[in-house]
From Swiss-Prot:
The gene is apgM. It catalyses: (2R)-2-phosphoglycerate = (2R)-3-phosphoglycerate. NCBIfam families: apgM, PRK04024.1. One of its GO terms (biological process) is glycolytic process. Catalyzes the interconversion of 2-phosphoglycerate and 3-phosphoglycerate. It holds the Pfam family PhosphMutase. The keyword Protein transport does not apply. This is 2,3-bisphosphoglycerate-independent phosphoglycerate mutase. The keyword Isomerase applies. It comes from Pyrobaculum calidifontis (strain DSM 21063 / JCM 11548 / VA1).
Amino acid sequence: MPSVLWILFDGGGDRPNGGKTPFHVAFKPTIDYLTSLGSCGLLDPISPGVRPGSDTAHLALFGYDPYKYYTGRGAFEALGAGIELRPGDVAFRTNLATVDSSGVVIDRRAGRYIAPEETRAVEEVMAKIGDEVAKRYGVEVVYKSTVEHRGVLVLRGPVSHKVSDTDPHKVGMPVAKAAPLGNDREAALTAEVVNYITARFTEAAGGLEINKARAASGRPPINAILLRGGGYMPAIEPVAEKYRVKAAAIAGVALIRGVAKAVGMDVYTAQGLGGTKDDVFDHAVKLAVELMGKYDVVFLHVKGTDSTSHDGDFQGKVAVIERLDKALAPYLDHLLKNYFIVTSDHATPVSIREHTGEPVPLTLYGPDVVPDDVAKFSELTCWRGALGRLRGIDIMPILASYLGLSEKFGE
């Protein structure tokens, strides 16, 4: 039986820059060849004009209505980081960041790269702050770094997810104060705890040896922690029950691993796949091809296209696309016997450096997929394809249908 290899370029969609996009410019003969034999279209990850987060977009792409199942990013980040959430736990996505002397954010990612010894120093600080919070508020704090500047913070105790973010989501703005979004005592306590952690981290960071070393090398200090997406783990019907599809995901980023786990996918990682713009994909693609013999759908997440977009790096984004395509090339004959789908979870235009709401290109190849006349995978070409304009939530039912796994609606 054939299976599906699904390549997802995170933030891969873009706007024309000088009349061209990274997908259009990139030399990607394998993807373009399969595109020429398949059917193309445009994809609204959620719905037209909606700027998706990576969390809500992946829920939709995996076949789950985010308006029904989304309870906050933090829970998926925690699950992907290997933290098993208990009932009542509230989790947040964190960014290590840089602020100036007045508390204004000047870099939401503290230069993005965080060395292993810097990660250890941050985790030691957070452990001490956690002890203070436990004594002061009776709330347990669990903190874990994930990739680069990213991390997860879990609060355990009489807490609530109904608090606002401290992350201002843009530079040039002060770190926000968490505020309760409800009238309950738990929300008020949670906001107080979050604000305490935020203030204490900046106080403690001033004396860290790692920041002296970073200053000496011209790197921005790690002197703030930004929290966002407070949430709890929702109850989700596994994808194997909802769509009768046995699925696996290969990802280096905690958020994507967490969403995949939450919907019941088996999750793998691979050498070279760390969730950065410098990822190398040979081992990940090899693993994906091997897993195709065991699963109906194998999903491979490529983070680098989003990271380079947020950095405004057009050529870097092109390079990520080309590295992935080069890794696919040795397996072309195998791919031709199976199904192959490529798309993005959202657009992150290099010129904007943020998620935007326009549709992204989509291509679907299969031995029995009716081809159209599109020969190149790009925003500038896929709009002419036979698939038309789809939503993210349409993808899994389409794949299940081609695999012969979907149930008939009606008699």
